[in-house]
Each structure stands twice: as structure tokens, then as C-alpha cells.
Design a protein with these regions (language model features):
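Juxta-kinase regulatory segment immediately upstream of eukaryotic protein kinase catalytic domains
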Residues: 2-43
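An alpha-helical support segment within catalytic cores of ATP-dependent transferases
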Residues: 23-36, 154-217
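ATP-binding glycine-rich loop module of kinase domains
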Residues: 50-77
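Conserved HxN/HPN-centered segment at the entrance to the catalytic loop
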Residues: 84-99
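Short pocket-lining segment of the protein kinase catalytic domain that shapes the ATP-binding cleft
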Residues: 104-113
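Conserved kinase catalytic-core helix
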Residues: 115-165, 199-211, 218
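Conserved catalytic-loop position in the HRD/HxD motif
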Residues: 221, 226, 235
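Active-site activation/catalytic loop segments of kinase-like enzymes and analogous catalytic loops
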Residues: 245-322, 338-353
Length: 387
């Protein structure tokens, strides 16, 4: 760890680093042993692709812990320091530094339980039938964004770039450059569209140029697992001054489609202790038919986009909030949304039906988003199939 970061932690986070002069294997037995020496017992531990986290207890008091590699730790701490005084977040209590990673202990959030407390849980609970008046909860979350987005600056560099510009080479080009079927013309519900490769080329060209964008202080990864309905926010690796268009495209994709269908299906480990979401996957499975003509190099897809009334209500409130603040969102919104559709998961590795569903969504949004972005998005989501 750099001396600058160490000094920043002592000054801004106000915790002392406890240093271990060896590498942590990040295996369950060793993690339990390390935390036991510090007086903690593990209540549960969750191993994910990019991180390990869980809940521990000491003297009948719970804490949330994360184990992060050195660069991820640096991003998390920097983001946390940037928003901790203006956003509702849980305080960091202790940090253990190893040669290859760090363990961060956060105060435990008592409003989060099994299948309760997160925006994800609220949406899942109301997906099938709105059981209570949800407006108060939705407005509570949206009003926080409204207050945050009132103060803006224009920037061309921002933390959320790692989800957009930084994934052009590492994901968009790497994953799809050799996909022959993406060079086929696409017809969706009887309407001619472009080749998927042509849309991808537009996305690459857009992010190849520098754009000064309207930015506001934000958590930076607004998916439904990172937002508590209290409200409270988690995960700070991309927190800081981010473009509102980035925040909007991320939460639009997360709320309406990804966290209802794709994410629980292709990254189920994220939903540890929030597993009710799995019961609704079939509900959001599209009624999709497709035909690939290799001779004419054409793809015909007939489909709908499934979501729920509560998810549409949330996004409509979000759009209304942006309009009331006079936030300018242009047609380039589709390029940010395309990066969410194509670069969270490699769609080429999905089941075939989901592969073509992803292509359908991309083309449907591309064809229907107009210069009046807010109006066209409201029209688009009003045509989604409510299940």
C-alpha cells in the first residue's frame, strides 16, 4: 500500500491499519483463522468472482467484511472517502492489510436481512403483486438522487469509466470481434434494423472520443443489490463524480431487466441471502422466437421485453426526477445502455435463447430511442409486457 493511501486512511477514515506481512490465500479456513485471532466468528461467508464478503460477529455485535485485492481496495477506499460525508453509508471500523489484499470491516446494516432491506428485495416482493403502497419507498430513494444531482460539474474523466470506456478493448472488442452472427442483418418484430456489428462500431466510435459530461457525486454502481431502501448505499469502487447519463443507464438496465432476469440467472452468487429473486426468473423469461438464415445472413427475432409494474413505476419516477432537474440526456444514451447489455456478461456464452434476447433488446432500444430521450423511454417501457 502506498504511503499516500495509508496517510489518507488514517486522516479521512480514522482507523489504524493492522498489517500482516504475508499473503492471504483467501481460502475459507485461513479467513476464519485470521478473523478468529481478532476475536471474530464468521456468521457466513460468500465467495464471488471478484470478491469475498460476509458477516462476522464480536461481543454479540455484527460487522460486514469484504476481502479485496490491492487495486480494488484502493478504489473502494478512495470512493468511500469521496462520498462518506454526503451519502448514507456504513462506517469502516477496521482494516487488515496483507501483501496481496485487504480485509475491510464495516458497521453492519441492521435494516438488511434475508430477502429484506435492499432495493432488490423491495422489487422482488412487489413483482407479482403490489402488496403495499410502494410510492413512499420509491420517492424516498428518488428524492435522495434528486438532491444529489442538483450539484453538477462537467468532466471527461470519472470513476465509472471502468464500466464504459475501459471495457471497449477488454470486453466489447475482445468478446465480439470474431462473432460472425453479429455481422448478420437483424429484423425485430418485422422491423428492419442494422447489423449488430454496426451498432457495436458506433459504440466504439463514440467512446473513442473525449466527451465532457454532466457529472454529480454518486455511488457509481447503482444496481439493486447496492441500494438499501432506508436509503443506504454499498460498494464504493466507482464512487465519485460520475456522469448522470452513466448512473441512469446503469439503474435503468438493472431495475427493469438485468436484476430481474439476467443477473440472478448468470451470477447467482451475488444474491446470497436474497434468494427470492430466483423464484421469479421464469416469470421474466421472454416469449421469444428466432430464425437465423446463414445463406442470406439475416436474423429474424420475434419477442417482447418482460418486466413488472413496480419496476416500471420506479424508472418512470427516476425519469421524472431527471426531467424536473433539467438534466440533459441525449440520444447517446443508447451507447451507454449498449455497454450494459453487452459487457456485464459475455452474451456469446449465454444460453442461445438469452443470446438472441440480448440482441433483441439492443436493437429494440436502438430503433426506438429518439432525440427526445425521456419521452421515447417512457413510451418504450410502457410497451414492455407486464408479467
Amino acid at each position: 500500500m502506498s504511503l499516500n493511501l495509508e496517510h489518507l486512511i488514517k486522516e479521512k477514515v480514522n482507523v489504524e491499519l493492522k498489517k500482516y506481512n504475508y499473503q492471504c490465500k483467501k481460502e475459507e479456513q485461513e479467513i476464519r483463522s485470521i478473523l478468529k485471532k481478532e476475536g471474530y466468528s464468521i456468521k457466513y461467508i460468500n465467495f464471488q468472482n471478484n470478491s469475498t464478503n460476509g458477516v462476522i460477529e464480536k461481543n454479540n455485535k455484527k460487522f460486514f467484511f469484504k476481502i479485496l485485492g490491492n487495486q480494488d481496495f484502493s478504489n473502494e477506499i478512495t470512493g468511500y472517502i469521496g462520498i462518506k460525508d454526503k451519502f448514507p453509508v456504513n462506517k469502516i471500523k477496521e482494516i487488515y492489510e496483507f501483501q496481496n489484499c485487504c480485509i475491510i470491516l464495516y458497521e453492519y446494516e441492521n435494516t438488511i436481512h434475508n430477502n429484506k432491506g435492499l432495493l432488490n428485495d423491495f422489487l422482488v416482493q412487489n413483482d407479482n403483486e403490489i402488496k403495499e403502497n410502494p410510492k413512499q419507498i420509491i420517492k424516498r430513494i428518488i428524492s435522495f438522487y434528486s438532491n444529489s444531482f442538483k450539484m453538477t460539474i462537467n468532466n471527461s474523466q470519472y470513476p465509472m469509466q471502468q464500466f464504459y470506456q475501459d471495457r471497449i478493448e477488454s470486453r466489447l472488442i475482445k468478446w465480439y470481434n470474431k462473432e460472425k452472427i453479429l455481422k448478420y442483418k437483424v429484423n425485430i418484430n418485422g422491423v428492419e434494423s442494422k447489423k449488430t456489428s454496426e451498432i457495436i462500431k458506433e459504440v466504439i466510435n463514440f467512446f473513442d472520443k473525449e466527451h465532457k459530461l454532466e457529472c454529480s457525486l454518486s455511488q457509481g454502481d447503482p444496481n439493486t443489490l447496492n441500494i438499501g431502501i432506508k436509503p443506504i448505499f454499498f460498494d464504493f469502487a466507482t464512487s465519485g463524480y460520475n456522469p448522470i447519463i452513466c448512473e441512469f443507464s446503469a439503474i435503468f438496465w438493472s431495475v427493469l431487466i438485468a436484476d430481474a432476469y439476467f443477473c440472478p440467472k448468470y451470477h447467482p452468487k451475488s444474491y446470497y441471502n436474497h434468494k427470492k429473486v430466483f423464484k421469479n426468473i421464469d416469470k421474466f423469461t421472454p416469449n421469444l422466437q428466432y430464425e437465423v438464415n446463414d445463406t442470406e445472413k439475416k436474423i429474424n427475432i420475434q419477442s417482447n421485453i418482460k418486466t413488472s409494474e413496480i419496476r416500471i413505476d420506479f424508472i418512470k419516477e427516476y425519469i421524472e426526477m431527471l426531467e424536473n432537474l433539467n438534466v440533459k440526456i441525449g440520444k447517446e444514451f443508447i451507447y451507454f445502455l449498449a455497454m450494459r447489455i453487452l459487457c456485464i456478461f459475455n452474451i456469446s456464452k449465454m444460453k442461445e435463447k438469452d443470446y438472441f434476447y440480448s440482441i433483441f433488446i439492443l436493437h429494440y432500444m436502438y430503433k426506438n430511442i429518439s432525440d427526445d430521450v425521456y419521452d421515447s423511454l417512457n413510451t418504450i417501457i410502457s410497451k414492455f409486457e407486464i408479467t
